[in-house]
Amino acid sequence: MAKILVFDEAARRALERGVNAVANAVKVTLGPRGRNVVLEKKFGSPTITKDGVTVAKEVELEDHLENIGAQLLKEVASKTNDVAGDGTTTATVLAQAIVREGLKNVAAGANPLALKRGIEKAVEAAVEKIKALAIPVEDRKAIEEVATISANDPEVGKLIADAMEKVGKEGIITVEESKSLETELKFVEGYQFDKGYISPYFVTNPETMEAVLEDAFILIVEKKVSNVRELLPILEQVAQTGKPLLIIAEDVEGEALATLVVNKLRGTLSVAAVKAPGFGDRRKEMLKDIAAVTGGTVISEELGFKLENATLSMLGRAERVRITKDETTIVGGKGKKEDIEARINGIKKELETTDSEYAREKLQERLAKLAGGVAVIRVGAATETELKEKKHRFEDALNATRAAVEEGIVPGGGVTLLRAISAVEELIKKLEGDEATGAKIVRRALEEPARQIAENAGYEGSVIVQQILAETKNPRYGFNAATGEFVDMVEAGIVDPAKVTRSALQNAASIGALILTTEAVVAEKPEKKESTPASAGAGDMDF
């Protein structure tokens, strides 16, 4: 396959065009007056969204070189989303500004590596300032404000605050689609552990890459399963019931895994397999915890149970099992309350006698899993398009709220990034040459989110930014784009999680500096396909 090679300025400019294509589509969604973006779907109705990462994921450019730039910017959005769960649009806007200002300087003869060092030092200074401005999130009011801002919707904020109040800040909260028009909060007993599906072929929803099993049997095996003959008797028994099956084992491999995948793909049996959580003796105990929660029995040869002799009565049951690539949540386990309480009491006794800090931490984790429940937010809407958009906003808001609990909140609306400018300006005085220029690139980029929020609301961005910067006494002073007033952002409830703001800046600078130091791009050469006269009048078209 022939390749295209592009060097120096031409390579960087091609990447910049790709970056701009994604950023221009994404940045219109920023802020309370952010505009909608309509996404065409191959099947079904179009999606209308204000979520930056959703828009970014949809962009594929025809030009191979530009598409590489677009993919790099998508990486900024998805990385920020993975770390903090929100802030994707802010990260995109920052990255675009760093690339734009940086390439101007590289074209004028600046040393890209010195610029990169300057950018990194400036980001470090800005991050310290963000941490200094952070306010810890203690009460319900602060949690509600963060969720409301993230979703642009007070109803979302209230429900997430209710959910966190019920299950605690460390509790498990899941967002599901409701069959009705109403959005409701339900509290369900549940058990979650950090192991995902062994094979992606077990996925039932390719869009979210999740496997969901409703009213499932749960087979809990202590050993590694590789021999399919051991597994077949119980598989046949479950297949006759027509119910799905979750297998939790040390590992499932070889012909046993192949058999499960083939049965799943053929539709003979809805099945998923996950590795057991923990290691050694702790794994044995956690499997017993899961057995207590689901009302099953651990199939262990130590206890005299063999897998080939397993019966349906030994299997656990659960209303719903949700498995992602990283974790498994068992909701509505059919275990007896007294069995679960016996496990909890046993762990409490162990806690009293243990001296090891590590063992204590792990025991408390097990206790939380057994004692805690799952808060389920069931999202309802009139149409499928609205439902998907609303569910997405709930997920975003939930992630933002968790990030806020972790690292605190800062004034929103791009104000915190503007306040970080003073730290960067102090740093610029200590730097010289192209390193100082690199820091100035970050200084200019820090204005961009506030400017964009104002412009999306129909105001002149640069005027708003200057007015905020002119107020030096109150670091929380900023512009409420929803009402068009200048206010104390924290008092007005316009706050962002510090983690989101920090991650957005760090990821944007990382990709921005990468593009500035690019000297060559290698891309696939597009194939010229022969035109085929598929239908009358179509002979001149490329297919």
Swiss-Prot record:
- One Gene Ontology CC term in the entry: cytoplasm
Write out the GO MF terms.
ATP binding; ATP-dependent protein folding chaperone; isomerase activity; unfolded protein binding
Q: Where is this region: Disordered?
A: 524-543
Q: Specify whether Ribosomal protein is a keyword of the entry.
A: no
Give the chief site where it resides: cytoplasm
Q: Which PROSITE patterns match?
A: CHAPERONINS_CPN60
EC number annotated for this UniProt entry? 5.6.1.7
Query: Keyword Nucleotide-binding on this protein?
Result: yes
Residue positions binding ATP: 29-32, 50, 86-90, 413, 480-482, 496
Database matches in InterPro entries: Chaperonin_Cpn60_CS, Cpn60/GroEL, Cpn60/GroEL/TCP-1, GroEL-like_apical_dom_sf, GROEL-like_equatorial_sf, TCP-1-like_intermed_sf
Catalysed transformations (reactions): ATP + H2O + a folded polypeptide = ADP + phosphate + an unfolded polypeptide
Q: Which CDD domains match?
A: GroEL
Give the UniProt family note. Belongs to the chaperonin (HSP60) family.
Oligomeric and partner information: Forms a cylinder of 14 subunits composed of two heptameric rings stacked back-to-back. Interacts with the co-chaperonin GroES.
Job of this protein? Together with its co-chaperonin GroES, plays an essential role in assisting protein folding. The GroEL-GroES system forms a nano-cage that allows encapsulation of the non-native substrate proteins and provides a physical environment optimized to promote and accelerate protein folding.
Protein name per Swiss-Prot or TrEMBL: Chaperonin GroEL
What organism, scientifically named, is this protein from? Thermus thermophilus (strain ATCC BAA-163 / DSM 7039 / HB27)
Q: Which gene encodes it?
A: groEL
